[in-house]
């Protein structure tokens, strides 16, 4: 199609999708006008987190449309967080600032399973419900709801896919996001538990981004030390994309990644 016709068709498709999703919202649930949703993410950069933000913004638009809120009554949303998932201090400081503004609800994804305890308690004391997404916290009694992947199952599925590819014997490396993140912990646990059924498979290296100075160089070093490596499990977008960007030479072990970025899809 000519560009102008293609753009028009795409616009109509998007509009139709928005109308459908808005019509599915149960408006019998009471929502206060001018409600403020504060989102503090593990990170703001990266394809995965940009998609998370887009999904949240679309949901807010759908709610405002379904409830027919006027411009003065509309629900609003802010989306903040560090640019890097490993910047735990910035996330904690952002949570402090956001809670001080007393939002209607706080949504967060925890970079460190333990680091946000004081902030969760402060939110609870101020009557601010907390919804956690992607990566949970240790004290879920302070959490109203959690929405995320079954991370242990994701790890199990990754192990099964590698076994399908390499058979029941081989050497595996695990390249993971920060060890203190709940999603990373569960994915690695699920992966290891699934591989425990195969005596001929060994995990020869286990790296975490918060345990090495340069993750890219650390992964490259593993490939040099184990030229006969059979498989690699990368637990999130950042690590998977970083690994795919390495010069692996003739050594091309099977790789399974999480988050399905465009880089991973292109590699497949």
For the regions a protein language model found, what residue spans apply to each?
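A residue-level marker of the well-folded mature domains of exported/periplasmic proteins
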Residues: 1-268
């Amino acid at each position: 199609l000519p560009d102008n016709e293609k753009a028009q068709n795409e616009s109509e498709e998007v509009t139709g999708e928005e109308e459908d999703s808005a019509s599915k919202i149960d408006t019998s649930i009471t929502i206060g006008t001018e409600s403020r949703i504060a989102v503090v993410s593990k990170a703001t950069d990266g394809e995965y987190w940009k998609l998370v933000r887009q999904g949240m913004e679309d949901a807010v638009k759908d709610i405002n449309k379904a409830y027919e809120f006027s411009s003065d009554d509309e629900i609003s949303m802010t989306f903040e967080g560090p640019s890097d998932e490993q910047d735990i201090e910035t996330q904690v400081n952002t949570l402090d600032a956001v809670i001080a503004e007393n939002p209607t609800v706080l949504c967060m994804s925890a970079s460190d399973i333990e680091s946000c305890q004081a902030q969760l308690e402060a939110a609870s004391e101020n009557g601010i419900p907390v919804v956690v997404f992607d990566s949970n916290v240790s004290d879920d009694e302070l959490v109203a709801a959690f929405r995320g992947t079954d991370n242990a199952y994701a790890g199990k599925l990754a192990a099964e896919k590698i076994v399908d590819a390499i058979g029941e014997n081989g050497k595996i490396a695990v390249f993971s996001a920060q060890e203190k993140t709940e999603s990373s912990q569960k994915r690695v646990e699920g992966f290891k538990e699934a591989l425990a059924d195969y005596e001929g498979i060994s995990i020869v290296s286990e790296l975490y981004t918060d345990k090495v100075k340069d993750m890219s160089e650390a992964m490259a070093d593993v490939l040099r030390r184990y030229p006969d490596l059979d498989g690699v499990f990368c637990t999130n977008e950042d690590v998977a994309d970083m690994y795919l960007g390495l010069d692996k030479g003739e050594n091309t072990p099977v790789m399974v990644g999480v988050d399905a970025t465009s880089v991973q899809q292109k590699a497949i």
